[in-house]
UniProtKB/Swiss-Prot annotation:
Protein family membership: Belongs to the oligopeptide OPT transporter family.
Ranges that cross the membrane: 28-48, 134-154, 254-274, 353-373, 449-469, 472-492, 564-584, 644-664, 697-717
Topology of the protein relative to the lipid bilayer: Multi-pass membrane protein
A GO BP annotation: oligopeptide transport
Species this chain originates from: Saccharomyces cerevisiae (strain ATCC 204508 / S288c) (Baker's yeast)
This protein's name: Putative oligopeptide transporter YGL114W
Length: 725
C-alpha cells in the first residue's frame, strides 16, 4: 500500500478538524508581517495622495501561497506542508498591518491636526504646522490600535454564524485559498439556492433524468456537467488526469501579478525622472491651470478603478463634473472666490470652496444611510415570527438528501483536479443551520471583556497624555469609545452586505454627534471633534477588517482564535511601521503639495469647523444645503429599496462617491474611471468564468502594489538629490 505524501495528509483533514491544525507559526508570522509591510507602504502613498486605502486581502493570500509553494521548499525541503488555514493566518496578519495608515488616522486625522489646526482651534495646545514626534505618533497609534479588534469578536457569532452575511471580498479570498491549496471550503446555501443549483445542473445535462439510462453513464454525465461553483476538471479521452486547472490558475495569477507589478514599478521610476507624465494637460492649458483638468496615466489609479468597479467610479466621475466642471467655474465667474486665487489654495481658492459642497453631500448621505439601516434592523428584530423561525429550523430530510446529492455532484466533477496532490472540494450545508467550530478554538469572553477594558484604558490614558485633560476631558473620550462601539456595528453590517466599509462616513457621523455634545465655545472644540471622529473611524476600520477575515476563516475552517492573534500581532507591528513611514513622508516631502494633497485631512478639519460653527465662504452655505437635501433624498430612496433587487437603484448615485469625486482633482478620477470601464468590459466578456474576477483583482493589485512599493525608491532619490527633468 503506497504511503501518503504530506500534502495528501493535509487534504484528508475534514472541515471540522481543521481548526486544530497548527496555524500560529513563526514562519507564517514573519510572512504575514513582510507581506503586510508591502501593503502598508503602498497604502501610505495613495492614502496621502487621494485618501484611498485597500485591504489587499486577496493578493496577500496569493503572495503567501506563492512563497510557501515555490521558495520555502527550496530552503526547508523537509518542513511540513503549508495549509489553507495557515494561509488564512498570514492573510489576516497582512491585512492588519497594511490598513494601519487609515486605522490610525495617518492619512486624515494626524495631518489634519498637524497641517491645518490653528492655535485657537487646539485650545492653545499646538501651533499650526507643528509636527508630532515619533514617540507621540507611537502613543497615538497605540491608543487606537486595539479596541476595534476586541469590539468585533463578540459580533462574529451573530453576523457570520447566524445571519451569514456574505462579506463578498472575504468569501472570494476563501475561494481563492481553497483552489490554490486544494482543500475543502464550506458553502452555505438556502433552499431556494439549492433548488436553483439542482435545476441548472439537470437542465445542462437532461440525460440524467432518462429512466433507462445506464447508472454508470448517468453518473458520468452528472459529473461532467458544470456545477454552481465551477468546473475545474481537465481530463483526456481515456479519463486520465491532465494538467490541474487549479495549478494552472495559480501559476497564471502569479504571472499576472508579477507582470503588472513590473509595469507599474517602471512607471513609478520614469515618473520621477520625467515628472510631466504625472499631469498631462489633455484638455488644454486653460482647464489645466485653472481647474486641474489633467490626465495622469498612473497604473495604480487605473488598478484602483478596476477594484472599485464601474458603478462607483461612475458616481465619482459625476462628482468630478459637478465639482470641477460646474461649481468651480460658477464660483469663479460669480466672484464667490477671488478670481486670482491659486486653484490649490484650500482656504481662498475654488478647491476650498467646492469642498464644502462635497462635505455636505457626504454627511447627508452617511446620516440618512445610518438612519435607514438602524430603522431596518429594529423593525426586523420586532417583526421576527418565532413560529416561522421554529418551522424553518426543523430538519427537512428531503433538503438534507438534496444537499448531499449536490455536494457529491460538485466534488465528483472535480475528482481529477489536484493541486500538489490535493483536491479542492466543497462542503454544502444549510444556511438555516449554525455551523460553528469547537468552543476551544473561539476567543474566550473573559479575554474579550478584559481586552475591551484594557484597550479602552490605554486609549483614554494615551489621549490625555497627548492633548491634556483640560483640552479633551475624560467624558469626551469615554463618549467617543461608546459611540465607536455602535458605529463599529454599522460598519461591520455595511461591509458584510455591500463589501464597502463606510469609515469616512462613520467618522463624519461621529463628528456631527459630538457637535451636539461639546459646547462650541469650549477651547479646543475643533481638536476634540477631530480626535473623537478618529477614534470612531479606527474602531470601524479594524472591526470591519477583522470580520472580513473571520468570514474567510469560517468558510475554510480556520481557528478564530488564531486569526484574533494574527490581528493583534499585525496591529502591534503596524503601530511601529506606520509611525515610521509617516515620519519619513513628512520629512522627505512637502505636505500638503500638488503631489500629496491629503484631501482626507482637509475634509476632517473642515467638517470639524463646520459642525463647530465656523462661517463658510460666500454662497457656499446655500450651495451646500441644496446639494445636501438632494443627496439626502437620493440616499433615502437608494437605501430603502436596495434590498428589493430593483435594477434602477444602480442609477442613483452614492453621495459618498460623488463627494470623493468633488474633492479629488480630476486626474485621479479620470484614471480610476478608465479602470472601472476596463473591469466592466472584462467581466462582461467573461461571464460564467468564475476565475475571471479573481484574475482581474490580481491584475489590479499588481498595478497598485508596484507603484506603491516603488514610491519608496522615489523617496530615496529625493533624499539623495538625484537630478530629474
Amino acid at each position: 500500500m503506497p504511503q501518503s505524501t504530506p500534502s495528501q495528509e493535509v487534504q484528508r483533514v475534514p472541515w471540522d478538524n481543521k481548526p486544530a491544525l497548527k496555524q500560529i507559526t513563526l514562519r507564517a508570522t514573519i510572512a504575514g508581517i513582510a507581506i503586510g509591510s508591502l501593503v502598508l507602504t503602498s497604502n501610505f502613498q495613495f492614502g496621502l495622495q487621494t485618501g484611498w486605502v485597500s485591504m489587499m486581502s486577496l493578493p496577500s493570500a496569493l503572495l503567501a501561497c506563492a512563497f510557501f509553494k515555490n521558495i520555502w521548499p527550496l530552503i526547508f525541503p523537509n518542513d511540513r506542508p503549508f495549509s489553507d488555514v495557515e494561509n488564512v493566518y498570514v492573510q489576516s496578519m497582512a491585512v492588519a498591518v497594511g490598513t494601519g495608515p487609515l486605522a490610525f488616522g495617518f492619512v486624515g486625522v494626524i495631518p489634519a491636526i498637524e497641517k491645518f489646526l490653528t492655535n485657537d482651534e487646539s485650545g492653545g495646545l499646538r501651533e499650526q504646522g507643528q509636527s508630532f514626534t515619533f514617540r507621540e505618533l507611537l502613543i497615538w497609534s497605540t491608543a487606537l490600535a486595539f479596541f476595534g479588534i476586541f469590539f468585533a469578536v463578540p459580533l462574529r457569532k451573530q453576523v457570520i454564524v447566524r445571519e451569514k452575511l456574505p462579506f463578498p471580498s472575504g468569501s472570494a479570498t476563501a475561494t481563492l485559498i481553497s483552489v490554490l491549496n486544494g482543500t475543502e471550503i464550506l458553502q452555505e446555501v438556502s433552499k431556494s439556492e439549492l433548488l436553483e443549483m439542482r435545476q441548472r445542473r439537470l437542465n445542462e445535462c437532461p440525460e440524467v433524468l432518462q429512466p433507462n439510462r445506464d447508472p454508470e453513464e448517468a453518473d458520468y454525465l452528472m459529473n461532467s456537467s458544470h456545477s454552481e461553483l465551477g468546473d475545474y476538471t481537465a481530463t483526456s479521452q481515456d479519463g486520465s488526469s491532465i494538467l490541474s486547472t487549479g495549478s494552472e490558475n495559480y501559476r497564471a495569477n502569479i504571472i499576472i501579478l508579477l507582470k503588472t507589478f513590473v509595469v507599474s514599478s517602471l512607471y513609478t521610476m520614469v515618473s520621477y525622472f520625467v515628472p510631466v507624465i504625472r499631469s498631462i494637460p489633455v484638455f488644454g492649458k486653460y482647464l489645466s491651470n485653472n481647474y486641474l483638468w489633467n490626465f495622469q496615466p498612473s497604473p495604480a489609479y487605473i488598478g484602483q478603478g478596476i477594484i472599485m468597479g464601474l458603478p462607483t467610479v461612475s458616481y465619482m466621475l459625476i462628482g468630478c463634473f459637478l465639482g470641477w466642471g460646474v461649481l468651480a467655474p460658477l464660483a469663479r465667474y460669480k466672484r464667490w472666490v477671488p478670481p486670482d486665487a491659486d486653484v490649490h489654495d484650500w482656504e481662498e481658492g475654488v478647491q476650498g470652496w467646492i469642498l464644502w459642497s462635497s462635505l455636505s453631500i457626504m454627511v447627508a448621505d452617511s446620516v440618512v444611510a445610518f438612519i435607514v439601516v438602524t430603522v431596518k434592523s429594529i423593525v426586523k428584530f420586532i417583526l421576527i415570527d418565532d413560529k416561522a423561525a421554529l418551522l424553518n429550523n426543523i430538519i427537512d430530510d428531503t433538503f438534507q438528501s438534496m444537499l448531499l446529492e449536490e455536494e457529491r455532484a460538485i466534488n465528483s466533477s472535480r475528482r481529477n483536479t489536484y493541486v500538489d496532490g490535493r483536491q479542492d472540494t466543497v462542503r454544502l450545508v444549510s444556511r438555516d443551520n449554525e455551523i460553528e467550530v469547537d468552543s476551544k478554538h473561539l476567543v474566550r469572553y473573559t479575554t474579550v471583556i478584559s481586552g475591551c477594558l484594557v484597550s479602552s484604558i490605554i486609549c483614554i490614558v494615551s489621549i490625555i497624555y497627548l492633548f491634556g485633560i483640560q483640552v479633551i476631558p475624560l467624558y469626551a473620550i469615554i463618549t467617543a469609545l461608546i459611540l465607536a462601539l455602535f458605529l463599529s456595528i454599522l460598519g461591520i453590517r455595511a461591509l458584510g452586505e455591500t463589501d464597502l466599509n463606510p469609515v469616512s462616513g462613520i467618522g463624519k457621523i461621529s463628528q456631527l454627534i459630538f457637535a451636539f455634545i461639546i459646547p462650541r465655545d469650549r477651547p479646543g472644540s475643533v481638536l476634540m471633534n477631530v480626535v473623537s471622529g478618529g477614534i470612531a473611524e479606527a474602531s470601524a476600520q479594524q472591526a470591519g477588517d477583522l470580520m472580513q477575515d473571520l468570514k474567510t476563516g469560517h468558510l475554510l475552517g480556520a481557528s478564530p482564535r488564531a486569526q484574533f492573534c494574527a490581528q493583534l500581532i499585525g496591529a502591534c507591528w503596524s503601530i511601529i511601521l506606520s509611525s515610521f513611514m509617516y515620519l519619513c513622508y513628512n520629512k522627505v516631502y512637502s505636505i500638503p503639495s500638488e503631489q500629496f494633497r491629503i484631501p482626507t485631512a482637509v475634509v476632517w478639519i473642515d467638517c470639524a469647523r463646520l459642525v463647530t460653527g465656523k462661517g463658510l465662504p460666500d454662497k457656499a452655505l446655500e450651495c451646500s444645503m441644496i446639494l445636501g437635501v438632494i443627496f439626502a433624498v437620493l440616499s433615502l430612496i437608494r437605501n430603502t429599496y436596495r434590498d428589493y433587487g430593483y435594477g434602477w437603484i444602480l442609477y442613483i448615485p452614492s453621495g459618498v462617491a460623488v463627494g470623493v469625486g468633488i474633492f479629488n482633482s480630476p486626474s485621479f478620477t479620470i484614471a480610476r474611471f478608465i479602470g472601472g470601464w476596463a473591469s466592466h468590459f472584462w467581466l462582461k466578456n467573461h461571464r460564467g468564468d468564475l476565475n475571471a474576477k479573481t484574475k482581474m483583482i490580481v491584475f489590479s493589485s499588481g498595478l497598485v502594489l508596484g507603484e506603491g512599493i516603488f514610491s519608496v525608491i522615489n523617496m530615496l532619490f529625493i533624499c539623495l538629490n538625484v537630478p530629474h527633468y
